[in-house]
Amino acid sequence: MLIILIKRALAKEIEFGIPIISVGNIIVGGSGKTPITIKLASKYENACVILRGYGRDSKGLFVVSSNGKILVDVKISGDEAMLLANSLKNATVIVSENRVKAILKAKELGCKIIFLDDGFSKYQISKFNILLRPKDEPTNIFCLPSGGYREPKGFYAQADIELLEGSDFKRVITIKKDGMQSELPSKTVLITAISKPKRLLEFLPKDIKMISFPDHYDFTNEDIKNIQEKYKDYSF
């Protein structure tokens, strides 16, 4: 935690001459950043979403999509960036470990507003900070590796806006069959590869099975074949 405090104290913010909004959290695991980023970015013209591209096979900066046109495959972008690109038909999505380079690239492409997915810890970037606070917070208040926080819990006070799950935003999940909202077959399996999959249980009928893989799991053809064979009498 001391290292985090020192980094924040020494950081000199850089102004980029473009509105930059960070949607982040300070806990380990999912908190709803991606769907909220999609919702916000969809409200603006010439928006750009920048993220690291967790789990991708590539390194460096890649423009995943430009005004909704997909430019790379999911191996290069990572699954989260591809979800953003497919969801935002009029936006640009960039992956890069170096957010500063990505911001400069977004400006070069003519973007007028930038959303940083999980950008709270980028202290050197002058930005408007939105922090999401889940309803189920870690009971251990220490930072990694001892506890469940990535930043000190007191850093919530440093957000420009703090959004509390349950009052400021809610998760609304609809399970669909064949792209249409309808009643699911009684023998259905839900396959997940997200952080904290148990949070889905409250939205599921009790007779649906759930198979959980690690967050951002890269499914192989063998995985899919094994699941289909094991649950051949089930819908997915």
Regions found by a protein language model. Name each.
Residues 1-18, 28, 218-230:
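N-terminal leader/targeting and accessory segments in enzymes
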Residues 7-68, 72, 171:
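Walker A (P-loop) phosphate-binding motif
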Residues 38, 42, 86, 105-108, ...:
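Short, well-ordered alpha-helices that flank and scaffold nucleotide-derived cofactor binding pockets
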Residues 48-50, 130-131, 187-191:
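Conserved beta-strand elements of the Class I
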Residues 54-168:
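Phosphate/Mg2+-binding loops and adjacent switch elements
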Residues 107-112, 229-235:
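Glycine-rich phosphate-binding loop signature in dinucleotide/nucleotide-binding domains
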Residues 138-233:
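C-terminal accessory "lid"/substrate-recognition subdomains
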